[in-house]
Amino acid sequence: MIKAIIGKIIGTRNDRWIKQYKKKVLAINALEPTYEKMSDDELQNAFEELKKRVRSVEKDLQEKTLLEVLPESFAITREASKRILKMRHFDVQLIGGMVLNDGKIAEMKTGEGKTLVATLAVALNALKGESVYVVTVNDYLAHRDSKEMEPLYHFLGYSVGTITASVRDDDERLEIYSKDIVYGTNNEFGFDYLRDNMKYSLEHKVQKSHAFAIVDEVDSILIDEARTPLIISGPVDRRMENYNKADEVAKSMQVEIDFTIDEKNRTILITEEGIKKAENLFGVDNLYKIENAALSHHLDQALKANYLFFIDKDYIVANNEVVIVDEFTGRLSEGRRFSEGLHQALEAKEGVSIKEESQTLADITFQNYFRMFSKLAGMTGTAQTEATEFLEIYNLEVVSIPTNLAIKRKDLNDLIYKSEKEKFDAVILKIKELHDKGQPVLVGTASIEKSETLHALLKKERIPHTVLNAKQHTKEAEIIKDAGLKGAVTIATNMAGRGVDIKLTDEIKELGGLYIIGTERHESRRIDNQLRGRSGRQGDPGTSQFYLSLEDNLLRIFGSDRIKGVMEKLGLKDGEHIESKLVTRAVENAQKKVENLHFESRKHLLEYDDVANEQRKSVYKFRDELLDVNYDISAKIAENREYALNQIFSKLKAFDHQNLSEEELLGLKNILKEDFNAHVGLEDLKKASPIENFIAEKLKSDYENKMKVLDSEQRSRIERIVYLQILDNAWREHLYTMDNLKTGINLRGYNQKDPLVEYKKESYNLFLELIEDIKMEAIKTFSKIQFEDEQDSSDAERYLDNFSEEREHESVTYRHEEALDEDLNVAMKAFAKTPKRNEPCPCGSGKKYKDCCAKSGPKKGLFAK
């Protein structure tokens, strides 16, 4: 209350920002007459001068210079837009551009021209000479926006590229990323970053810098998708029959007897009776013994699949596959899979083919990917409800931009009914009334199931209509565009189709504009605001109203008893509703509860991922050093050799190495032979003084003798590639260990320990072990490198060529969240460590190692026995 009064007197922080930006708008507008008089060539030359000015200063002074040239850059960009696109930036759009350049989020209502606004900040920041990324939510918008704005950018002397899922060729991707301005989806940018850190050449990395990114629909990408990391993964060996058996057991269990459901937290707790039943059906005496850990895990996931996840709401079944439905957009999430075996549990539930579980090979959250950028900005129509999260997680402030024309849309109070049937009956009556009048109506639903219920009711009443949900996602843009036609009735799930304007004719405006009906409040107020925002664009008339029932999930799970109490006191008859600001406010309070739960969940995820992120950055930095041809890899190998020997001697009983017993010397001899391929006689060890110097020289001379056949470039390439393989394999194993650690860490809470603190401690220790393992594995592998002909380097060159060729033709699938793809083990088998007897032979024969090269020696020269 006090805050509101102070805001009215001195203005809010947002008001003060807008006031400052308006002063700069005056400066930009003052330049317009000057640039209007220029020819195209003169205008382009003026912009080229700005490029020279910005690029001539030191890098750390470029941001300051950008602010100095901002008025000229914005004025030239606007003039160019007038000539090329036939569109002039409004003053409020200039403000939006300045907000983006300041690294903030511009909240602009639907229809205010966010795509055009972005050109101002993009053109300005591209002056520095580093690629600017424009991030969108789907391939359609990335392609549309880049093609629409490309003529403007070309006029200003910029090149433009678009990254979509259809761009498969690595060289083509490399070419696109070399452009001044790159449009693409958040998934493509994120996966390209992960792919870059699996490349074996710096020249093949596509993302050269992370200077500036503008994220369109920033709330969808940085908030809604923050809980689902990008993961590249490979298959894990699991027994597929366990999924089906667990599904049978789960289906036989009864709610409230064998298990209880916590709908608020979406968890299931098995009772003692349930445990006994499961043990009986699985045929085990104790479900929670260590050897039965896989069974108990499968059962947990099967229970979730059967009782917390629902077809046509959380997923659909299409083409013998379970496909996730995005809870926020209603779109199908093609290629995305639930993690930790949940997706396999859903496949067992629905009786479709079960795909293998997968192991993480590389991963990152959107939070940590986008926080890498030196400057980050965003645009959306709905951000203020999440302003705290944007500031706390991303250090992004939200600035609400005034509309160019006043909003005329009427937002009516919610209507609340006792039952869902009564609610839908009322919705159908309202739709019929509007349709008969010719006024277009857009109906928002919370799930595919509800949209199809409404579809059936409208069909029964013979009211023509169009349905847009995940099953019709390919026609999304076309359906949304036509939603403003006379008499149009459009049903849309969770307001998919963002980014597509619904334009109205004068006749429709006379009828009252687009009428929005929400059939259920979403868990997030922001999603509801997005639905409302489809109406009333650019000063158009319109109306919005939500129809609710006490049976809706939000009110049933989170709604206060006050709403139910009011309904009971009023003694409403069938079909009657209540409409009051008090009830609407109570509904919004319920939404705030859920929003806070989701915020805490995302923050919790980030706290854990921040631990892994520091390790990821460290590993990727070292990886880049190895890729650098100027890095002294030979010195690193020598350092590892010294470390390995220190480790060996530290484990021997007598630290006085000259007084080792014969038994210890024999053990040392065997270690040198097995681990380092060094053949040393027992008598030589007895005579050596000091022994550590003798061994160090022996290992070094053996290695140098093998490497003599290579020229310096060949040697450097081989050493770097082998070391990279060792690093990559160790990192993947580390990620697997970290996944397992994270899965069980919450159990520490029962022991009065903070799981996050425990996770930090243990992950740090695991990281130290990772570093040690890499050093030891590196020196062991390098010690075993051999050539068939020690006088000929062609063997090494052949393997380098094969390596490059096989890497180039790897077929790998990258997916959002949990992805299944071909195993990423690099085909340069010659450099692999000695396999175990039952592992596949690295020569590629397809036989087990014990039946192949273990008997006859390696078929390929670089692999040592």
From Swiss-Prot:
This is Protein translocase subunit SecA. Zn(2+) binds at C841, C843, C852, C853. HAMAP family: SecA. It is found in: Cell inner membrane; Cytoplasm. Monomer and homodimer. Part of the essential Sec protein translocation apparatus which comprises SecA, SecYEG and auxiliary proteins SecDF-YajC and YidC. Its main location: membrane. The keyword Translocase applies. One of its GO terms (cellular component) is plasma membrane. Gene3D superfamilies: Helical scaffold and wing domains of SecA (1.10.3060.10), P-loop containing nucleotide triphosphate hydrolases (3.40.50.300), SecA, preprotein cross-linking domain (3.90.1440.10). It is a peripheral membrane protein. Belongs to the SecA family. GO terms for molecular function: ATP binding; metal ion binding; protein-exporting ATPase activity. Its cofactor is Zn(2+). It is an enzyme of class 7 (translocase). Transmembrane segments: none annotated. Its EC number is 7.4.2.8. It comes from Helicobacter pylori (strain Shi470). GO terms for biological process: intracellular protein transmembrane transport; protein import; protein targeting; protein transport by the Sec complex. Keywords: ATP-binding, Cell inner membrane, Cell membrane, Cytoplasm, Membrane, Metal-binding, Nucleotide-binding, Protein transport, Translocase, Translocation, Transport, Zinc. It catalyses: ATP + H2O + cellular proteinSide 1 = ADP + phosphate + cellular proteinSide 2. Part of the Sec protein translocase complex. Interacts with the SecYEG preprotein conducting channel. Has a central role in coupling the hydrolysis of ATP to the transfer of proteins into and across the cell membrane, serving as an ATP-driven molecular motor driving the stepwise translocation of polypeptide chains across the membrane. May bind 1 zinc ion per subunit. The keyword DNA damage does not apply. InterPro entries: Helicase_ATP-bd, Helicase_C-like, P-loop_NTPase, SEC_C_motif, SecA, SecA_CS, SecA_DEAD, SecA_motor_DEAD.
